[in-house]
Amino acid sequence: MQLLSILAIFSAYKHPQLRVFCMLIEFSVSNFRSFREKQTLSMVASPRLGKKQNVFDPEVAGEDFPKLLKVAAIYGPNASGKSNLVKAINLISDLLHKKPGDSHLIPADPFRFDRELVDKPSEFEINFIHEGTRFQFILKTTAERIFEETLFFFPKGKENLLYSRKFSPETVENYTFGSLLEGGTIVHEAWRRLTPPNSLFLAQAVLNSSEDLQQLKSPYEWLKNSNMCIGQNGITTWSIASRSMMMHSPVTKSALQDFLQHLDVPITGIRFEESEKFKSEIGPASKINDYVKLVESEAKTKLTHTTALGDAEFDFTEESGGTQNLMGFWIPWLHLHAKSSEKVVVVDELDSSIHPKIVELLVENHLVADKKSQLIFTTHDTHLMNTKLLRRDQFWLTERDANGATQVFSIHDFQGRGSEDIEKRYYEGRYRGLPILSRS
């Protein structure tokens, strides 16, 4: 990903008349890292659970589609697979951000405890809505090559194949093109020839299409750009991006200060010290990894704190982990609440070094906002279970079985009432998803 693509996020604020709807229905994964059999995270809301502000109507053309959840919180013991779920959701987007044709390995990693699965492809399935149309994308891949790539769409609720690509060691790679796929036989064949074994056909088709061929661009844009996944190390990158944006925009700097002060972080001033090396080497097309290194080494961020005794200035590196993480979460927060689009933000360990009341406020503000964006996060903070902010179907749990395989399930799968003390019942083991501890 290049710096320019990160800075482009602000372009959404310049065009409020444009509205792009991007919504996740459900995501499934199998034979990937700690996932053995198919596990599904669903954002489809269960009926009759109340809390209308927690759900929204997805507006699918020609379909009376059920409501979707605005928020999903994922709990579970350490090493139970929460972070692996975030990695799985991010894999397709990560693959689309790689330059087609590069000799890269696909970040697929099979379930290693089952010898029969080690040489088989990891499988991913994602159902989503983009610009009023429902899509289903299926990917089966090893680290070396793609074994299946299939895309369906559902005009007026009816399943239609756009294309399917399948490979097996015993046969040549086979492509099937749906009758409604635009372009024609000659164009389809050209796309096929341009697609190497380790790249997505979808990417090649879009990147090698003329302006009048837009049918595949919609699902391509959703899969590439509508999911913002933030892993445990990714928050640092977004913190760097936040600081880079402030360097270029006083309005941005003021907005971040307001965001932090709203969360009771007493920062009243932000300034930057850029070295000559930084000014000479950085450019809009710089790769984000190079940019991160330059910002960390050649651009110092100074933060002013104000108390009753006066002001004091601190370097960014002197700030607490929580303050640094909040600065990193700020861009995803803008991503969630941009006026011109709805997005899906997935955060691993949202509560990392952040006070539970701040997490509660962030979740509450997202729920009451008139938006169809979705926030999915992993956490160990059970305080949210006791706030009555979320419904039973918004709490998800992970745990590993005796074979080391991750299971994913919702608290709503267990009998209970909306008025029950979810946190208390969770610690009593009523829903599982707890660490099994032994006293030494």
Segments from the language model and where they lie:
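Extended helical coiled-coil dimerization/tether regions that scaffold
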Residues: 22, 30, 236-318, 437-440
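Short polybasic amphipathic segments
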Residues: 27, 124-126, 146-153, 299-307, ...
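Glycine-centered tight beta-turn/hairpin loop motif at sheet-sheet or coil-to-beta transitions
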Residues: 34, 130-134, 156, 308-311
